[in-house]
Amino acid sequence: MAKKVEKLVKLQIPAGKATPAPPVGPALGQAGINIMGFTKEFNARTADQAGMIIPVVISVYEDKSFTFVTKTPPAAVLLKKAAGVEKGSGEPNKTKVATVTRAQVQEIAETKMPDLNAANIESAMRMIEGTARSMGFTVVD
């Protein structure tokens, strides 16, 4: 018989850098998860994506065992990396902080495709372009 999921915990953790310190430790402790077991497994699974923030969904079962699924990095993080900036604009409609090319947007859309609810790459690109505009980035051809 399948185990019953008791709780879902969603976190965004830097790849390969999960530690028992806040915010990871308290979130997992409340759910009753073995914190060291999770951090070791997460760090091993994400070691190749160093420097990225990885969203993770942890399913906690009634017997306190757990499984987790890592997602693709947030579009905003990928856009900042592609544009080479630290953060987006505080007022995106007035101040533009960077430009990204349509090719970079397509590359990000292809990376994000498994996690987006887009039917094709064009609609995924439009989603990423919208994120870029809301961050104060200009999209050029």
From Swiss-Prot:
Any coiled-coil regions, as ranges: none
GO biological process terms held by the UniProt record: translation
Molecular function GO labels: large ribosomal subunit rRNA binding; structural constituent of ribosome
CDD domains (alphabetical): Ribosomal_L11
Pfam family, one: Ribosomal_L11_N
PROSITE patterns: RIBOSOMAL_L11
Protein task: Forms part of the ribosomal stalk which helps the ribosome interact with GTP-bound translation factors.
Family: Belongs to the universal ribosomal protein uL11 family.
Record note on quaternary structure: Part of the ribosomal stalk of the 50S ribosomal subunit. Interacts with L10 and the large rRNA to form the base of the stalk. L10 forms an elongated spine to which L12 dimers bind in a sequential fashion forming a multimeric L10(L12)X complex.
Identification of the protein by name: Large ribosomal subunit protein uL11
Protein species of origin: Streptococcus sanguinis (strain SK36)
